[in-house]
Amino acid sequence: MKCLKAAYIREEIQIPDKVKVSLENNVLKVKGPKGEVIKDFSYAKGIRIQLNEGKIILETTFADRRKKALLYSIIAHIKNMITGTINGYRYYLKVISTHFPISVKVSGDEVQVSNLIGEKNIRRAKILPGVKVTVKGEDIVVEGSDIYNVAQTAANIESSTKIVGYDRRIFSDGIYIYKKEVIGLEQSD
């Protein structure tokens, strides 16, 4: 069966009052109370992005499966940008040490992990721009307005403590992501 193309697809995203949005050469800037997120959509060939009367309008013509998927992915990115600038995103990580006490500290634009399974060298994880990392005992909190930078920073911290050559069932030492949330939309447990 042949896949039919949609002749015309138009989707609108309402811009909240707290948010300022600007568009220039397919570079979308969303600014809100929690910060500013900039994303370049110039890779999206065949998809037109416009600002009109408090709405972001996305249009495409003769959309096949790939173009539709790209359109709705861009919509999800824009909604994440708006949510991030209004509320922000937060990731929680836990320091697990069974054999040697792990020491974690933030230094400039990196997180330094020392004494992981007794290693003398310091493992480093890069903190991406616009992300704040705080260490409180065995808990690490990563927060910011850009979900992609927050998630990548948390992943950098987690992967910097990956142990190779040991049985993971016994040597469970490391730093692990255990919770993700939108700030202000916390759920009571």
Curated annotation (Swiss-Prot):
HAMAP family: Ribosomal_uL6_A (MF_01365_A). InterPro entries: Ribosomal_uL6-like, Ribosomal_uL6-like_a/b-dom_sf, Ribosomal_uL6_a/b-dom, Ribosomal_uL6_arc, Ribosomal_uL6_CS2. It comes from Sulfolobus acidocaldarius (strain ATCC 33909 / DSM 639 / JCM 8929 / NBRC 15157 / NCIMB 11770). This protein binds to the 23S rRNA, and is important in its secondary structure. It is located near the subunit interface in the base of the L7/L12 stalk, and near the tRNA binding site of the peptidyltransferase center. Belongs to the universal ribosomal protein uL6 family. One of its GO terms (cellular component) is cytosolic large ribosomal subunit. Pfam families: Ribosomal_L6. The keyword Ribosomal protein applies. Part of the 50S ribosomal subunit. Keywords: Ribonucleoprotein, Ribosomal protein, RNA-binding, rRNA-binding. NCBIfam families: PRK05518.1, uL6_arch. This is Large ribosomal subunit protein uL6.
